[in-house]
Amino acid sequence: MAETKDVFGQEPHPVEDDLYKERTRKRRKSDRDQRFRAFPSMEQSALKEYEKLESRTRRVLSNTYQKLIQSVFLDDSIPNGVKYLINRLLALIEKPTVDPIYIALFGSTGAGKSSLINAIIQQAMFLPVSGESICTSCIVQVSSGCCVQYEAKIHLLSDQEWREELKNLTKLLHRTEELSREEADAWNRDEAVEEATWKLQMIYGNGAESKNYEELLRAKPKRKIPTSRVITLKAEEAEELSIKLDPYIRTQRRDWDGEAAEMRIWPLIKHVEVTLPKSDLIPEGVVLVDIPGTGDFNSKRDEMWKKTIDKCSVIWVISDIERVSGGQAHEDLLNESIKACQRGFCRDVALVVTKMDKLHLPEYLRERKAGNQAIQSQREAVLERNEMIKLQRTRILKEKLKRKLPADFKVLEASDLVYTVSAQEYWQQALLTEEETEIPKLREYIRKSLLDKKKRTVTKYVTEAFGLLLLTDSFNSTQNLPNEHLHMSVLRRFAEEKVELLEKAIAQCFACMEQPLQEGVRTARTSYRCILRACLVRSKGNQGFHQTLKAVCLKNGIYASRTLARIDLNEALTQPVYDQIDPVFGSIFRTGKPTGSALMPHIDAFKQSLQEKMTEIGIRSGWKYDSCKKNFLIQEISAILGGLEDHILRRKRRIYESLTASVQSDLKLCYEEAAQITGKKACERMKDAIRRGVDRQVAEGMFERAQERMQHQFQQLKTGIVEKVKGSITTMLALASSQGDGLYKELADVGSEYKEMEKLHRSLREVAENARLRKGMQEFLLRASPSKAGPPGTSL
């Protein structure tokens, strides 16, 4: 028999092969160690243990998959049960390790978002900070990865997306009549006109604002646009990439006459992704997202703005010390963040107050209420003021969250709702220590979030894999086949009864929305005129508002710019409804103790009842000899119903936004009519057209239709949940009883894989216990360590 040869026709050398395997093992270990550089040694140990568990589990699954494929490869037909196993194994093998944790830094221009990111990643001036020039409204994502260089990918609008924006920009600038000098001055001072003019000039040069849509389509941009619509920048050092990136994400003043080609492309930028090499401070798997506070005039960028907010599991509302105690912009940011908790994946909201080193000591001492201790230095004043701000803003934020969210929502239990940070002091440490700037505290939060998610994900992954291996191994067993059909019939009837009860429980849960919806609709009907007046009337009249209002109409009731507060007529009109439904909506989609209004606890109770019944039937009917089957059913029920949570979260956003989407759809013709108005007193005539259109739609039941559409969305979710549960459980029971139903096929022996998987599953408890022990040791050491003193030279 010929000896086995490798693909190059040479015999493999055992010594060289061993050396290659050893080098590969060391390289993988080194890569894993590099990935965890951002964590302290105790947390690194926990992560490595979980990583090892996951890696070994994937290897066992891959070996099992290969054996199953080989055992059925030549068969004309594959039993349904085997197909199910193969598909589930493949899905688990290809499942991502951990979905990234997106942390939004959400704030207005100048709030200090970029400075904060620079401090967190320990790269001063890496992202351009807002000075005399302001940054673009594009989203910037910063993460660390396995790359060896610093890299930035600048994603541009597609040709179709730019054409859509170009059409709206030219409509905005189109004049059909001669204007008086006063009217022309007002036109030129209109913020929307200035923005549109500037964008066209940046792309096509001076004079572009006077050309029509067709002329600009034929015009050649000042800078060549890559056909891939992606610009990739790379550099060996952070400073080098920063210099290359700066022109793309910093927009210059409107009176700037420079000719740098990079500067001229910013109106086309959709978003930017920056990847750092493996970092000592930011772990791989965390994405910091710099999100501007107002959205964008371009539909795609604005849609991405909202979707990015909704996919973030953590939102830090960034506000500097001079703006946090008032101002509509700050309130708007908080409201948008709370809505993200309702409609998106957000589980944690915190206020990050920046520039906390700013303090005028004489003024502070004059306004300071008499305290127990006299202030001796600037440092003491800053620390006292920071603590006071933290207490005040925590109380205010908690009260605001309580009005909108369920009382047991996780964010309300957070130990830190407000952070007081100073990026400048982090670098200089003239007044505050590094710890007192709270930058390390934010890094610790990031690490803890990733570590907790890794633990949950790996535990779920190993448990799910163990369930599959249990059944795969039991397929080759022929014990208790005569009684199998009876066992499954009892379980199937029980499951059908429980599904009916679950459907009723979901219906009762969603019925809780009916009363607040009705009350909200009544309030909206009586208050919509006042709301509309507040949106349409400006304190300084129509000066500078004419084309801004036209932009609102061109975008179906929404206008977002880099400098003005976001305008959303549809959201404003439906706000009275949201004020009524928000607490109940949050209660429905929360996790916690089972109540009449919470959805997930009902699904958890359904899961528990099925698992208990399986255990009961197993004990009573002899499954003690086939514990693999019982354990598989219990594990698979968890996997099936666990997957429902993602489905529910995805539908939640559509349900929540159905009110504004309905109103926007009903007012579409009204907006289109108003956008066509030109000539004398066009602004007032546009307002009248909007008022008439809204009056007409309200009289015809606009708010009632919005209510019906939301209720229809809830009904669709209920139907989807029940159908998914029925289908999955039917498939699972058919698989478990496949031997008795004639679907049995002898498979390859996976006994060794099952034994290894059993060991890995037992290891979960040991790893969790080790992690708890390390955490306790770490907390003890932190308590025992002396607190840091202030920087030298700070006391009088």
From Swiss-Prot:
Give tissue specificity per the record. Answer: Expressed in germinal center B-cell and in lymphomas derived from germinal center B-cell.
Where do the coiled-coil regions begin and end?
158-185, 745-775
Q: Which positions make up the signal peptide?
A: none
What does UniProt give as GO cellular component? cytosol; nuclear speck; nucleoplasm
Highest taxon of the source? Answer: Eukaryota
* GO terms of biological process kind: cellular response to lipopolysaccharide; negative regulation of apoptotic process; regulation of nuclear cell cycle DNA replication
Keyword presence, rRNA-binding? no
Write the Enzyme Commission number(s) for this entry: 3.6.1.-
Per its record, what are the GO molecular function terms? GTP binding; GTPase activity
Q: Where is this region: Disordered?
A: 1-35
Cite the InterPro entries for this sequence. Dynamin_N, Nuclear_GTPase_SLIP-GC, P-loop_NTPase
Regions of compositional bias (Basic and acidic residues) in chain numbering: 1-22
User: In its keyword annotation, does this UniProt entry include Mitochondrion?
Assistant: no
Chief localisation class: nucleus
Q: Where in the cell is it found?
A: Nucleus speckle
> Which PANTHER family does the UniProt entry name for this protein?
NUCLEAR GTPASE SLIP-GC
User: Which purpose does this protein serve, as stated in its record?
Assistant: Nuclear GTPase found in germinal center B-cells, where it may inhibit function of the activation-induced cytidine deaminase AICDA. Reduces somatic hypermutation in B-cells which may enhance genome stability.
User: Per its record, how is this protein called by name?
Assistant: Nuclear GTPase SLIP-GC
What organism is recorded for this protein? Homo sapiens (Human)
Name the lineage: Eukaryota, Metazoa, Chordata, Craniata, Vertebrata
